[in-house]
Design a protein with these regions (language model features):
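Extracellular/periplasmic periplasmic-binding protein-like sensory domains
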Residues: 237-316, 423
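Venus flytrap/periplasmic-binding-protein-like
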Residues: 72, 116-118, 123-126, 202, ...
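Short beta-strand segments enriched in small/hydrophobic residues
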Residues: 22-42, 97, 165-171
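N-terminal signal peptide c-region/cleavage motif recognized by signal peptidases
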Residues: 16-20
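Beta-alpha junction/loop-to-helix N-cap segments that form part of ligand/metal-binding clefts
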Residues: 24, 37-47, 56-129, 138, ...
Length: 426
């Protein structure tokens, strides 16, 4: 009889104790379509980092993590459908990996109290957290990137690019158009001529644009491309013998698959970046031990160290660290999206923290606040070595021109606030 009572007591206790649900970090991926070459390694890195936390650490704060995927195909309509289906899973944060999708879900995420992290993409003026309460774009945004390109050109031209001609080749979408306003302002400030050339989706046809570049003879070309557009552009630049060292892509046009198809002709091509490249980080030793060697990798495990795999890992790490902060701040392990949002708004990533995570110097230090959802806006430059088939960082991470960018962010964000009857919070 005593044994039966003990059994009943145990069962009652288990029934009364809350069952910890997984912490849900959905992946809005695109493993199909013309941009799959970029979508796959990012999604793999994102998933693998959370698998590492589950296998090595038992999750985050003792709670397991799940990473449900929803395939968007980089299609805005499908992306919105994914948002609607994923929000039923109580996600802590969404990462749409598409500027078009981001624009569509901004009002939804605010209404649904779901934070959205658009790392290095999305609506740039979302840096103003006083207006965009649930959108974060740390550690850098497109306008930081545009300024980073100009800063680098100033650096290699002894601080003077007046009279130079810079061509922008851009994907003809909300994504590709993001840097134009900033580059126009910077051209007025520094006296260079800006030429803009749109490339229609998906970017396989670019001969007319590069023939125009051959006629215009710009000193430098910068590119806001993605997917197949990038490798076509690099090949077309090689075809007209444009100097690769004068061709600088955005961070979404600076991965291995963007340059490998052109072979030796891509040597010297450059791209801005907001994080490190390569495999020389202790976290990747753990990734091999706990994830790849156990057969748990999202892919086949051979993308570790590639640019976009690393970016997926970085995005997952930043999400996980915000979740840890939310747990610490609230004393609640099974945190909510609202708690996650509050923690993201106070996130501070220091070098000491990155060292402890096995990611020393993986990215610049940055802090987030109510007023600043975009971090510090530090931008570096990487260059492709075709013979070694590797990217190398060739500049320091430098501050973008906030004298130009901050007023643009204020103007755009306040216009959004007026249109949507939003009272700035800070």
């Amino acid at each position: 009889m005593k044994m039966k009572l003990a059994t009943w007591a145990t069962a009652a206790l288990m029934a009364a104790s809350p069952v910890m649900a997984d912490l849900v970090f959905p992946s809005m991926s695109y493993r199909t379509g013309p941009f799959a070459a970029g979508g796959i390694p990012f999604a793999d890195g994102y998933a693998d980092y959370f698998t590492l936390l589950n296998e090595r650490d038992g999750g985050i704060g003792g709670v397991k993590v799940s990473v449900p995927e929803c395939e968007t195909g980089y299609n805005t309509e499908k992306g919105v459908e994914c948002y609607e289906s994923l929000k039923a899973l109580n996600p802590l944060v969404l990462q749409p990996l598409s500027t078009g999708i981001t624009y569509q879900i901004i009002p939804k995420s605010i209404a649904d109290d779901i934070p959205v992290h658009t790392m290095g993409y999305g609506r740039t003026s979302a840096k103003n957290g006083g207006v965009f309460s649930h959108i974060f774009n740390y550690p850098a945004n497109y306008w930081d990137g545009a300024s980073g390109v100009v800063n680098y050109l100033l650096e290699i031209n002894d601080g003077d690019i007046s009279g130079k001609k810079i061509a922008l080749v851009y994907h003809n979408s909300s994504y590709g158009k993001e840097p134009i306003r900033t580059l126009e302002a910077l051209s007025e400030k520094h006296g260079f001529e800006l030429v803009t050339l749109a490339v229609d989706h998906p970017g396989q046809e670019q001969k007319s644009q590069w023939l125009q570049i051959r006629r215009e003879r710009p000193d430098y070309v910068t590119m806001w491309g993605w997917g197949i557009m990038n490798q076509v552009a690099v090949q077309e630049a090689a075809n007209i013998r444009f100097p690769m060292e004068n061709f600088i892509g955005v961070w979404w046009a600076g991965a291995q698959h963007d340059v490998l198809p052109a072979g030796a002709a891509a040597d010297g091509y450059k791209a801005i970046t907001f994080h490190a490249v390569g495999t020389d980080y202790p976290v990747f030793d753990d990734m091999r031990k706990y994830v790849v060697d156990k057969g748990l990798a999202a892919g086949n495990g051979d993308q570790i160290g590639t640019v976009l795999y690393n970016r997926g890992v970085y995005a997952a790490m930043l999400a996980a660290e915000a979740a840890k902060d939310a747990q610490a701040a609230t004393g609640v392990a099974d945190i909510t999206s609202s708690m996650m949002r509050d923690a993201m708004e106070k996130l501070s990533i220091t070098e000491d923290r990155m060292v402890a995570l096995g990611m020393p110097n993986f990215g610049p230090e940055f802090t987030v606040s109510c007023e600043n959802h975009g971090g510090n806006g530090l931008v570096g430059v990487a260059q492709w070595d075709a013979s070694a088939q590797e990217w190398n960082i060739i500049s320091d991470f430098k501050q973008s021109d906030q004298d130009v960018i901050s007023p643009l962010i204020k103007d755009d964000s306040m216009a959004f606030a007026a249109e949507n009857a939003i009272e700035p919070r800070c």
